[in-house]
Amino acid sequence: QLIAEQNGFISSPVHASISGTVKKIEEALTSQGTYVPAITIESDGLMTADENIVPPAVNSREDFISAVKNSGIVGLGGAGFPTYVKLDPKQNVDTLIINGAECEPYITSDSYTMISKAALISQFFELMKKYIGIKKIIIGIEKNKPDAIEVMEKLAESDPAVTVKTLPS
């Protein structure tokens, strides 16, 4: 469920990760020593999705970018950079680089996602090809993630646009 709206071009909406009740909105201290707005939600223990959430209708490049924008997808490299900005329709993008070598805590999540969600990743690649014009996909994975490498190499066997690059750990 949407809990915070985008307030500028280089920002994104925020969705609740749990179902429950908003208890407070206040400034919270981050591990970097700065204060940021934070929303505290008391979980109801049910993890139910808002019934108003429906998959977006995507029939064009603009629809696809809008769906990515409204979903709140951001990069995990520290800045939380909105993904939709990278898909700007004024730019001609033909290569997608997937960073499967992020630092902790995300490297474990990256590896798990590549192993357990290969079919969804493949669907995402097809959408990127169809709506953004991607021709080449490069997935970088650290060599100490052999299971993720194996699964992504199998995906690459069925998609000539995909290349897996093993990176030093």
Model regions and ranges:
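Short hydrophobic beta-strand segments in globular cytosolic domains
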Residues: 2-3
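Iron-sulfur-associated redox domains of electron-transfer enzymes in respiratory
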Residues: 10-169
